[in-house]
Amino acid sequence: MAATAERETEALVAVSSPSGDAVAAEQIVSVVSALAPAGARIERLACSTLEHAPDLLISVDGPGERKVLLVGHLDTVVTHDAFFAPQRSAHHLVGPGTADMKGGVALALGALRALEDRAELGQASLLLVNDEEWRSGTFAHTERFSGFDACLCFEAGERTIGGDDAVVVRRKAAGALKLTARGRAAHSGSAPEQGVSALLALAEAAQLVASLSDPAGPERLTAVPTILRSGEAINVVPGGGKLLCDLRADSLAAIEIVEASIPSEIAGASIKVERERAWPGMDAREQTAPLLAAASELLGRPIVAGERGGASDASHFAVAIKITIDGLGPCGGHSHHADEYIDLESLFSRSEVVLALLDALLSDPQSVG
């Protein structure tokens, strides 16, 4: 499984697929479809972001009862201009999308093949979306898979300080706010008093949002203004502008409180607040503990339950599928940068983790309650 995943990761990374490029999405979908098991059903599902290319669903059936969902995404962050073909460097495979998350997609394909011949399997489906990196619509796929026994998501993996393999069973909720300010433009030299600065209003809004950050509090809220754009000329009071803020907390309710705290007018400028995207929180520590214990015993080494602040589509499925485990991809680094990489050795260790989880899931009824 690992050796095949190494070859397939390289083939996937060789295709540039930045989020929102429909032509590139069709190219990467074509590559993945060619790697699907011979007897698999291949479907296209409408993407949550309607202007993006349709998502890809690959399914295999068996005579048993267990239903397993495998999840990943095909879109990446790095633009075509910054893209380069994958390169090997010492023990790494370097290239845009290696860790986030084409290495994980390759392992997910291996997991689908491993499930194909299991007598306990009723259905295994691999869902690969085209808008995870930037989504403007409401996530569309949760209800379709609500009757599945388990969801395994193949975002990048990690190890503990002691070197043990870790998986992700807890994630923060995440949201992005867009604030649009409307002030009044005026000549900054001859009549600045006639203007209402959208820039100053947004700067004040940014300070307000940042002041609500409470990472040590009960919701572990982080509220971070990240992008401010305002002004068109050096001699004009800015009449408009936009501010983007990244919010993370244990629940969406904490994010909604921040959103509600922003006034509709600041320093004379009107403020419009829009939530551009949102992921629910995920906490599957209790539900996944028996499965992780059973898989660790089969593997002969610990699989550690971990948590992560970054958003993932696993969180959407954790609402409906109690056994949801994320972070099953290879270990790596520099995500969202051109020099992103994976540790090639981790393809082997993570393959072992995935296969142990599948064995425990299919053979041990107690592992899924």
Question: Language-model segments: what does each one mean?
Answer:
Residues 101-170, 368-369:
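Acidic/histidine-rich catalytic neighborhood of metal-dependent amide-processing enzymes
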Residues 89-91, 111-126, 209-219, 361-367:
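Phosphate-handling active-site elements
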Residues 1, 17, 157-164, 169-170, ...:
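Metal-dependent amide/peptide-bond hydrolase catalytic core
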Residues 71-72, 127-129, 152-155, 180-182, ...:
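Short beta-strand segments
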Residues 75-79, 92-107, 187, 313:
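Glycine/serine-rich anion-binding loops at beta->alpha junctions
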Residues 84-98, 182-185, 300, 335:
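Glycine/charged-rich beta-loop-alpha catalytic/anionic-binding loops adjacent to active sites
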Residues 1-96, 117-120:
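Acidic/His- and Gly-rich active-site-bordering loop/insert found
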